[in-house]
A protein has these predicted regions:
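Membrane-core helix-loop-helix motifs of multi-pass transport proteins
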Residues: 26-116, 306-339
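Hydrophobic transmembrane alpha-helices of multi-pass small-molecule transporters
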Residues: 87-100, 104-208, 212, 327-330, ...
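Alpha-helical transmembrane segments of multi-pass membrane proteins
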Residues: 1-11, 36-59, 76-83, 243-257, ...
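Hydrophobic alpha-helical transmembrane segments of multi-pass integral membrane proteins
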Residues: 1-26, 211-226, 237-276, 280-281, ...
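Alpha-helical transmembrane segments and their immediate interhelical/interface regions
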Residues: 1-32, 165-186
Length: 347
């Protein structure tokens, strides 16, 4: 369990979608080799690492967005680099506490041996299908390693120059992270054809997510245009203080995420309102942003949208893991609210 969760945290720092898929695969392989592991808890614990890892990872939408020049709130909060928003003392301390507690909780939450559900489903290895290329210039280019390497080298040069100019943390904007992964893929796939085929294969895992997003987009529009988001934030301002504002930002983000499970889309709705509330109360805007991210991520344990690809990989259903996910969320709620209230007083 410890190995699985450490792997989950590290892979989440790389990219949340990457972690969502590879962590259940590792859980599956570990369960094949080690008897007596409760597989539903392995999946729930691994998924929780993806969620929590985003609170200290460079690929979280809001952290990357507010570090991007020209973002829509720049005139109010400026550009906040990730060494300010992600790697500050309060955030690192809170993340460490929750991460350690989650590992301990996952280890201790083991059912009696007669109730353990082991992984049983066998997966056949996919046989790689050889594609016969036609003897044309276009098909030769589609199967060419040189094309991918040339694009990859050009991308690597741009990445290095950006790091030199802005520093590593200062470079981590939304556009840069997308560009970084595209460049890495140029070296991982040795032909354009294999890259496109891999992309098409993995799109199968996202089908249910893609179908649901238009509906959540509609909910986002209703919340925005109806003024419901403004009502929530105004209610917070009425009861919050400078010290408790991060806690209320966390709670409001958690509630809104149940209806808008998209961190970037949710920030578009709540960001301006939370910034305005923070300025009215003279609260620390960085702590507000951190609390928003924690709140958005926490209820992903209750909102099942992003666990669907993971369940598809291992052939499980939501009912098999949701109880464990909700159990972890309860403890996160307690730790995070206490953390955002007391840790800023100490660190």
């Amino acid at each position: 369990m410890i190995l699985l969760m450490l792997f989950g945290y590290v892979s989440s720092f790389v990219n949340w979608a990457f972690c969502t898929v590879v962590t259940p695969i590792l859980a599956m392989q570990l369960s094949k080799q080690i008897k007596g592991l409760h597989f539903p808890m392995m999946i729930a614990a691994g998924y929780s690492t993806m969620i929590l890892g985003q609170c200290l990872g460079p690929s979280a939408s809001v952290f990357a967005l507010v570090a991007t020049e020209g973002h829509f709130l720049q005139d109010k909060i400026g550009i906040l680099t990730q060494d300010q928003t992600v790697y500050n003392g309060v955030n690192v301390t809170l993340f460490t506490i929750i991460a350690i507690f989650t590992v301990i909780l996952s280890i201790l939450t083991v059912p009696p041996q007669d109730e353990v559900v082991e992984f049983k489903k066998e997966f056949d290895d996919d046989v790689e299908e050889e594609i016969e290329l036609e003897n044309t210039i276009a098909d030769k280019l589609n199967g060419s390693k040189i094309i991918m390497y040339l694009i990859g080298i050009a991308g690597a040069i741009v990445i290095i120059l950006t790091f030199v100019e802005k520093g590593i943390l200062g470079s981590l904007s939304v556009n840069f992270i997308i560009f970084l992964f595209m460049t890495i893929n140029c070296f991982l796939y040795n032909s354009p054809r294999k890259f496109v085929d891999a992309y098409k294969e993995n799109m199968v895992l996202t089908t249910e997510v893609v179908i649901q997003f238009p509906f959540y987009g509609g909910l986002m529009g209703m919340i925005t245009n109806s003024g419901f988001g403004a009502v929530i934030v105004q209610a917070i301002v009425n009861v919050a203080t400078t010290t408790s504002m991060p806690v209320w930002a966390y709670i409001s983000a958690s509630l809104t995420n149940l209806f808008i499970p998209s961190q970037g889309g949710q920030w578009i709705v709540q960001g301006p309102l939370l910034v305005e509330a923070a300025q009215q109360l003279n609260a620390n805007i960085i702590h507000i942003i951190d609390a928003f991210v924690y709140g958005d991520e926490a209820t992903n344990l209750l909102q099942p949208l992003y666990v669907i690809p993971a369940l598809s990989v291992v052939g499980m259903k939501l009912k098999d893991v949701w109880g464990f996910m909700a159990f972890i969320w309860v403890f996160w709620l307690i730790l995070t609210t206490l953390g955002f209230y007391f840790i800023p007083m100490i660190v």
